[in-house]
Amino acid sequence: MTSAPLPFPPRPAATPAKALSAMDDLIAASMVGQQEMAQRLDLNVTDLTCFAYVIQAGEDLLTAGDLASRVHVTTGAVTGILNRLERAGYVTRRPDPQDRRRVRVAAVPSAVARVYALYEPHYARLDALFADYSPQEIAVLADWFTRATTLANAYREELRLREEEAE
């Protein structure tokens, strides 16, 4: 008697240490990949990261202060980033309807299209990889990534506070 095929392939045994090592490999590959993507777009990594946040915000346009907070740079530094992104045709600045002293940052549609064209083949491969996982496994992955991001951000903030206290 043969058993029915499994709907999803069995997973190799892993330990937290092995998972952390795999995560470190992914982070390193992602960092190198991000540098290469930025070069192809004639941007530096920080500018590309800011542009990604602008894209992610969609119609809920961000302020310069929002970007500075997300990328953990000063508002002065983010002004330079926005100047470069605007000169390169990636963003435009719009007056804030609630506060005339502030501006909101909008992505230029043709620049979004260029970025998507570059990233789309990679994301298609990731989508294909997700097809190997059950909905429950994907839910676990999404939960883990979300919680790990929260931990990473909290630890980075803790390090900043320690540094400020030491000064």
Predicted segments, located by residue:
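N-terminal helix-turn-helix DNA-binding core of bacterial DNA-binding proteins
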Residues: 34-73
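Canonical helix-turn-helix DNA-binding module
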Residues: 61-103
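Terminal interaction helix/tail motif
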Residues: 119-167
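Charged, amphipathic alpha-helical coiled-coil/dimerization segments
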Residues: 86-139
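N-terminal leader segment of winged-helix/HTH proteins
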Residues: 1-41
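Residues at secondary-structure transition points
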Residues: 14-17, 41, 45, 62, ...
